[in-house]
């Protein structure tokens, strides 16, 4: 029983051990499997971590490469922008330098133009000055020559008196009687001419008085102090008194020659008659009869004599008449103006005044054949001159002026289409150049246009 029990217990023990062994084996298997699983998971984790590390490294490398590329691109862009800015700045500098050079050239050209213009104006002023100086010298020389001639006349008269007192020759007396007869005939002719001159003077005076009254009534705006009719009356009275005094002196000389029986030699008579300077009252009358043929020469001679010496004798007046008649020429076709001579010095009765002044635009043609308007300051005086200045101070006159005695027509073109509100004034002037008529055009406001026209037309020559 005990053996059976022992066998049973050993069997159970073996079975238990076998069971335990199986459980251990199973457990060992499970552990081995777990270990394998852990190893596999560890390997997988390592692979994943390696892959992740590679991915991260690759990602960072790509990012670094992108940053490097962006850095290089930015550096290129910065260089390009710097080059562009430098190029643009250089171009701007070049354009500015060119503009500077152009402006300097323009300034030099303008300075040269202004200098040349001023030099031309100075030359014109110097020419005018020289012309005035020559005119003054000529007038002074004429005055000196007149004084010399008067002195020579006095000396010759003294010689004639000496010859008449010393000579008692019948031949000279006969010759003087013959000359006396001839001179008497010439005196008669001169008296007839004098009557004609007086009639012409009266007609001229009446015409001028009518014209002056008409102009005074029409142009009451113009203030001109002119005493022309009185001067004409004085000239006619001086001519009549001088010629009557010459006739009385001639008759008195002939009576003295016939009564006293004084004579001169033939040589002296021939020399005195051949020269232009009168030597005796008889030769004075002969020279006056030969030289005085027109009304203009008689009036001029009498006026010059009366203005030069008011206290001289009748013989001196006649001698000066003859000298002036010999030097002056007859003027028959001179147009009559409104009691205005060519200069204020030749007519002391005329007092020059400024009638109108103001700004006008004068049309001129440039070098490119285009019409340009030049604004200038003009003044019109009673001596018939229209002067041009650069400004209203009238310190710098231009070389251009218009003599209204040569103007024969004036027209107005109203409402200029190129310049609204302005009208054109056209002056037609006679010239001695190739083109006989010159047209000068001025532009001014339509309100002042008629005023300028009235002023200019009042100073134009009268149409006969």
From Swiss-Prot:
Residues 215-290, 317-347 are annotated as: Disordered. Keywords: Coiled coil. It holds the Pfam family PH. Residues 8-210 form a coiled coil. Residues 353-461 form the PH domain. One of its GO terms (cellular component) is membrane. Residues 234-288, 317-328, 338-347 have a biased composition (Low complexity). It comes from the Eukaryota. This is PH domain-containing rcdII. It comes from Dictyostelium discoideum (Social amoeba).
